[in-house]
Amino acid sequence: MIFTRTNALKGEITVPGDKSISHRSIMFGALAEGTTRVTNFLRGADCLSTIDCFRNLGIDIEDLDSEILIHGKGLHGLTAPSSMLDVGNSGTTTRLISGILAGQRFTTELNGDESIQSRPMKRIMEPLTLMGADITSIRDNGCAPLRIHGQKLHGIAYTSKVASAQVKSCILLAGLYADGTTSVTEPYLSRNHTEIMLTHFGADITSKGTTATVTPGKDLHAQEIIVPGDISSAAYFIAAALMVPDSEILIKNVGINPTRNGLLRVCQDMGADITLLNENYGNGEPTADLLVRHSELHGVTVCGSVIPTLIDELPVVAALACFARGTTVIRDAQELKVKESNRIDVMVNNLRAMGAHIEGTDDGMIIEGGYPLHGAIIDSHLDHRIAMTFAITALASDGKTSIKGADCVKISYPGFYEDLTRLAK
């Protein structure tokens, strides 16, 4: 797919529903008593993998176009699957469902695509094993495919080495099936959608600082969920408006959960003109409309506790830094190496191909901004966030940019290119 420089981006857009919340709505709805109704569900490939997995576990899920209905069977209503669960490209599905399956009364095997088969699963296998789970890497390499023999679990107090919502959520979900209380402490607070939504469904979840605790014994009850727009999808339009001169974009109804809104804070630190309008609250999640205008940016240092709040948006930050005056430093972001691709290496190589002055480090990147970018052949490595980042970067660069594997955006944003084209007209 070919992209070229564009004139000002103007208009209003509504981005798809939040991917993290969409995944969890299916999982928690399946474990609840009664029918959970979900509107603005993200029908990206990852979330559809979650639906397929829970259908294979005996849950009736209806897709009525305008809404998703999950006919839950309670915490102990899942049944043994008829075949290996296919998680596709979804790390969220893999890690969260493993916590649920660890406490069932049957054995499950799960696998995914080539990317999933290289992503680290020891980070969930170790705490689940401490809880009494029987979970193994079938190839004995710490990655999928996984085999999980359901067991009687017991609560633990676990200190995680990484600030990962997937690890935390996996342990908390296993904790619903454990004897005694389970707690997870992180080095920094990761996104907290699991804690918010499980509380909404009736679970006994408490949070203090970077520790989340679940006490089992309460049934979950069906809910009505309105999924806010995904700030990770909004990020590309935020960046495009900031990069392309004279642009102004209004992005409607975006989730601005403080554990997810690090991009807004970093962009504003860089000098971005971003205004929050119509701030609201629904299902425990804050939302707002975002009005973004082209801005002159300057370099910043991005590190520490802000990293988990924008881990998926760091490729966008790296691209924005190329258009900012001065130096931008990203550090404490080792997690970028174990995403759908090694996002440090991929961003460095692709931005260099476009003329950027960028160096990779063991835990991030250093970018010298202010040098003009030019078109190049970009390898997305079939990573949706890489493809979308370079699609918008090309709009502010000279010449033609060709993106290999551009259709991988269907993982999280099937209509991305259509929305981008509409704003560029």
Q: Whereabouts are the PLM-identified features?
A:
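Structural preference for solvent-exposed beta-strand-turn elements
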Residues: 1-425
